């Protein structure tokens, strides 16, 4: 039966190659990716809401609920069991994994990612994990695109495009935001915008959004009604809000990396579970709005609250009934949200940073405007408007994606009347954070390793190249105790003009250049007088097998060498890299990468 299925697929692939042009088939695949991704997003949302409603239906809104101490630990524990014994692979940092797949795995994402992130994030968020469902569904969508392309034997350049289609469809489907889905793919995943890539991305995003509209209706995700039109006199305050959001984004990014670094140093999953679960439980117990994605709090702030309604933000907390402490309460939430999100993922949970970014931005915008109004600055700042703008500001800063921030918030809320201030806030936030952090929270790990694909063509091509593909191993090795006569025999057996010198353990200790011994190599009376140890010189530099190609090229530029030896972490000789080999490989990647 399996053979029949395989042969049927093979027959279809052969038929497709004869009857359907490549570009047209890519459009068909992008349409399918949009449909599958939209349904994956809908399934994820339904499961999360069902779990949350089941667990919190009988909560008393007027007093602290001690179940907050239990639920997050249970969620992280169940997620950890699922990942460890069912998935048996790391599925955290979804967007970072997509970036890595594009730059180092030729767009190939493991098959289990088409479903594993849905289950893991549903458990984590449903039980109160303080993270978002969007990054897991983006990874799911990208995995759907990658594996669909793999099934039909598409080349890796097309796989990378289908990965982008999956991401665009995921954002469009879960947020009902097709433009934001397209822009996210271009800004965050850094898929190049060409005519051959634009149409598939659009088809996938529009298809996913349409499916969401059909199933859940055409209403925006958040209800927002503009009570006061934007006035130009508020532009200085909008710029200040953008700078404030940039600083909040910087705090969130650096604190997140620091806390996750602490969890990374814990070697056993049980220590991570205990530390993460305890931290998250205590934080949610003290600040219940940290429970789950936080969209209920966003809804409250965007709807606008009277003084009498402020207590609703503090439901189930010890602050309930003290509306005069709202500002302090929200500032504490801004400070502790990053610890709640880090504890969720670091402890073994699965979730993304879309929702935390939106959540922090909404609260930051509200706090900024509410504080300004309290001290009676010259212009009144509509708090719900600034809460909306804050969402765009923090998202733009955390993701280093100002256009995504603008279009996503506009489509999420229908707040198109605030398009100008949304742009101002997003740009101000982005310009603020890049002064301190050149890479987004998703890309900084890959950028440090030289594994990040960017819109910079030269760096992008170097990123797509791999060290193992340019290392040449047909060099004859010699040893320091060999005499000149033995060296001449080695030279006669080689077509190279450089000879690595290694000890008995294979450690590189030097090189012999043919040009350096040319004047004595034919004088037989000197064959027993000189040894390789006396004739060898140090290599201009050493390359390591873990070096990125950008580091390799920088070393060649610094040394002006034509050949450089490659060693491992223990300095054992592996081979040589030559400029000619690099240039040939560079040219091959350039031609393939630039085809349109």
Describe every region a protein language model picked out:
Residues 508, 562-563, 573:
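Short beta-strands and strand-coil junctions in structured, solvent-facing domains, enriched
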Residues 204, 425, 472, 514, ...:
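ATP/adenylate-binding site constellation spanning eukaryotic-like Ser/Thr protein kinases
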Residues 510-517, 575-582:
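Short hydrophobic beta-strand motif reused across regulatory alpha/beta modules
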Residues 474-478, 534, 539-542:
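Structural signal for short hydrophobic segments within the conserved structured cores
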Residues 465, 482, 512, 530, ...:
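Short beta-to-alpha loop/turn elements within the nucleotide-binding domains of ABC transporters
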Residues 478-495, 501-502, 521-524, 542-569, ...:
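The conserved cystathionine-beta-synthase
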Residues 449, 528, 593-596:
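Post-kinase regulatory C-tail/linker adjacent to protein kinase catalytic domains
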Residues 1-474, 479-499, 503-509, 590:
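Alpha-helical transmembrane segments and immediately membrane-proximal extracytoplasmic
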């Amino acid at each position: 039966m399996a053979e029949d299925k395989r042969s049927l697929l093979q027959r279809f692939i052969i038929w497709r190659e004869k009857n359907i042009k490549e570009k047209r088939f890519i459009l068909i695949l992008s349409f399918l990716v949009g449909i599958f991704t939209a349904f994956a997003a809908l399934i994820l949302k339904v499961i999360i809401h069902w779990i949350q409603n089941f667990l919190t239906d009988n909560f008393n809104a007027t007093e602290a609920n001690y179940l907050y101490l239990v639920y997050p630990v249970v969620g992280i524990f169940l997620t950890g069991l699922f990942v460890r014994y069912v998935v048996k692979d790391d599925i955290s940092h979804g967007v970072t994994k997509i970036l890595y797949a594009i730059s180092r795995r030729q767009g190939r994402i493991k098959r289990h990612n088409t479903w594993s992130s849905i289950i893991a994030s549903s458990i984590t968020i449903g039980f109160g994990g303080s993270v978002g469902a969007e990054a897991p569904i983006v990874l799911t969508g990208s995995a759907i695109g990658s594996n669909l392309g793999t099934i039909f034997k598409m080349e890796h350049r097309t796989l990378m495009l289908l990965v982008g289609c999956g991401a665009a469809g995921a954002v469009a489907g879960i947020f009902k935001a097709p433009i934001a889905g397209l822009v996210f793919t271009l800004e965050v995943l850094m898929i190049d915008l060409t005519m051959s890539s634009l149409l598939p991305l659009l088809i996938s995003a529009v298809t996913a959004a349409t499916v969401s509209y059909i199933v859940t209706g055409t209403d925006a995700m958040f209800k927002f009604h503009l009570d006061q039109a934007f006035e130009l006199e508020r532009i200085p305050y909008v710029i200040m809000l953008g700078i404030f959001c940039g600083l909040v984004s910087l705090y969130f990014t650096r604190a997140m990396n620091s806390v996750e670094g602490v969890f990374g140093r814990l070697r056993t999953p049980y220590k991570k579970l205990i530390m993460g679960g305890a931290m998250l439980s205590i934080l949610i117990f003290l600040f219940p709005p940290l429970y789950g994605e936080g969209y209920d709090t966003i809804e409250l702030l965007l709807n606008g609250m009277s003084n009498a309604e402020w207590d609703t933000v503090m439901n189930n907390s010890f602050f309930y009934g003290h509306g005069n402490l709202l500002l302090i309460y929200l500032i504490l939430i801004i400070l502790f949200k990053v610890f709640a999100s880090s504890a969720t993922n670091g402890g073994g949970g699965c979730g993304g940073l879309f929702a935390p970014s939106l959540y922090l931005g909404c609260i930051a915008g509200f706090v900024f405007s509410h504080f300004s109004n309290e001290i009676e600055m010259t212009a009144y700042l509509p708090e719900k408007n600034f809460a909306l703008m804050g969402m765009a500001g923090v998202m733009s800063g955390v993701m280093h994606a100002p256009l995504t921030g603008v279009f996503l918030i506009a489509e999420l809320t229908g707040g198109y009347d605030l398009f100008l201030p949304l742009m101002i806030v997003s740009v101000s936030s982005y310009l603020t954070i890049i002064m301190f952090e050149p890479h987004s929270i998703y890309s900084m790990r890959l950028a440090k390793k030289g594994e990040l694909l960017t819109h910079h063509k030269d760096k992008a091509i170097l990123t797509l190249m791999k060290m193992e593909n340019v290392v040449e191993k047909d060099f004859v090795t010699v040893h320091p105790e060999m005499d000149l006569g033995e060296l001449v025999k080695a030279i006669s057996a080689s077509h190279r003009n450089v000879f690595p010198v290694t000890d008995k353990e294979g450690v590189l200790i030097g090189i012999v250049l043919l040009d350096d011994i040319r004047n004595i190599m034919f004088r037989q009376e000197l064959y027993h007088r000189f040894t390789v140890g006396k004739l060898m010189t140090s290599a201009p530099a050493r390359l390591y097998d873990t070096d990125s190609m950008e580091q390799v090229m920088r070393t060649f530029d610094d040394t002006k060498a034509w050949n450089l030896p490659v060693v491992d972490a223990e300095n054992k000789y592996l081979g040589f890299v030559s400029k000619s080999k690099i240039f040939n490989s560079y040219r091959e990647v350039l031609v393939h990468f630039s085809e349109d």
